[in-house]
Amino acid sequence: MVFSTFQFLITTLLAVVCARAISLSEGDIPVLAMVIPALWILPQGGIAGLALLAAMTTYGLTLPIQPITLSVSTWVLFPLLMVVFSRRSSLSVVIISGLIVTTLQVGIMVTQSAGKLDGTPWVTLLQVLSIMVIWWAANHLKPASQHSWWSLGLILPLWIADLPYAALVALCLTGIMASMEAMMKLKTFRWNKLLCWTLPTAGFAALVITPSIEVPSPVFVVWLCLLGTAWMTDYIIRTEDNEDIDI
């Protein structure tokens, strides 16, 4: 349990470092940095692995175009998707949550169209879809012992090209995937569920508390609403389950 807790803290730290590296690079992250972690896990992924590779590639291509804070904040969809598509969920929960997400993201895209927020509306939509596919792929990947360790060698060209932040992002993402895969095998506690809540929150929070980074109000409000929606949905579902048990 002590080792698992330590591993959880290290994984959270990797998410914070990854978010800060992306911000310090000002979006100058080559798509290769996002592809390397997907290639590392590809041999045991099957269709899910290919979907992960495609989604990570797409997300990587959008980084130079979008504001960094918006790109990082989009990962808050992970806990919401986990709750909405859990076994305890229902069709009404999926529909209501879908309407909330759609409304909030349309608000962001309208703000971008009005010139009040940097970035492009269609790229915002592309990022949202990429995160959804990444969540689906991560949810269908199974732990395995085979990995493409050769893919880590691709970090060397990033370093030689004087792109240390890109190399750091690739290492952090690979480390996060490896840690989550290892913790998935543990039966004592549902660490991956806790990580699903913690990693997106910690990564974005690291940007919020950094004095040199200005988080646009629309981005912060939407992030907070999505996180609140995920938490409230989870709370309501749990409450209903407890009432059913009591009956």
Spans of model-derived segments:
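Membrane-proximal helix-loop-helix units in multi-pass membrane proteins
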Residues: 70-78, 86-157, 166
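Membrane-helix interface "capping/anchor" motifs
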Residues: 39-51, 64-70, 83-95, 136-147, ...
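C-terminal transmembrane-bundle signature of multipass membrane proteins
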Residues: 161-247
